[in-house]
Regions:
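Short pre-active-site segment immediately N-terminal to redox-active cysteine/selenocysteine motifs
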Residues: 27, 34-37, 108
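Eukaryotic intrinsically disordered and solvent-exposed regulatory patches
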Residues: 15-18, 50-53, 73-74, 97-102, ...
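Non-catalytic, surface beta->alpha helical segment in thiol-disulfide oxidoreductase systems
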Residues: 92, 102-149
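Thiol-based oxidoreductase modules, predominantly thioredoxin-like and allied folds used
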Residues: 59-75, 84-96
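Conserved redox-active cysteine motifs that mediate thiol-disulfide chemistry
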Residues: 33-50
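Plant-skewed but cross-kingdom recognition/interaction modules and surfaces
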Residues: 14-23, 83-91, 104
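A short beta-strand-turn-helix
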Residues: 6-29, 54
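Short coil/turn segments at secondary-structure boundaries
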Residues: 44-46, 78-81, 102-103, 126-128
Length: 151
């Protein structure tokens, strides 16, 4: 993950900040593009939160990075605090946000992409997978992602 988010700061659920390179090292990472003003996002976020909690409770090395499409920093923080899991987010205005929107061709939200450290997409439509497969058996889905990640 060092190459993709080099020099970036991530915010944790307790408001502390960490360097992306060290925090994401040796983890399977999903970029979550979402916004509080988006009804489909507010519908999907609790599903992702449940998936994340089950996977983390099982001791898996998994991290979600919230890439906000909110229009103001206050909106980002409010949406994150009220609805998201205990994952990380890029600070409002981080230059990587625009880079990721272009690189991953994000046209609509919510979008969830599982990526390798070099930025290669492992699972392009992870959102649909979380909704369709992750609701019944989150760990089985995550193990599929692990297999893709290692190949």
């Amino acid at each position: 993950m060092a190459q993709l988010l080099q020099g970036s700061t991530l915010v944790l659920s307790d408001d502390s900040k960490v360097q992306a390179e060290s925090h994401l090292s040796n983890k399977i990472v999903a970029l979550y593009f979402s916004a509080g003003w988006c009804p489909p996002c507010r519908n999907f976020t609790p599903k992702l939160k449940r998936f994340y909690e089950v996977v983390k409770k099982a001791g898996k090395n998994f991290e979600v990075v919230f890439v906000s499409r909110d229009r103001a920093a206050e909106d980002l923080v409010e949406y994150y605090k009220d609805h998201h899991g205990e994952w990380t987010y890029l600070e409002f205005g981080d230059p990587h946000i625009q880079e990721f929107l272009e690189k991953y061709e994000i046209k609509t939200i919510p979008a969830l992409k599982v990526i390798k450290p070099d930025g290669t997409v492992v699972v392009n439509d992870a959102r649909t997978e979380v909704v369709d497969k992750g609701a019944e058996n989150p760990l089985a889905l995550f193990e599929e992602w692990e297999a893709f990640y290692e190949s």
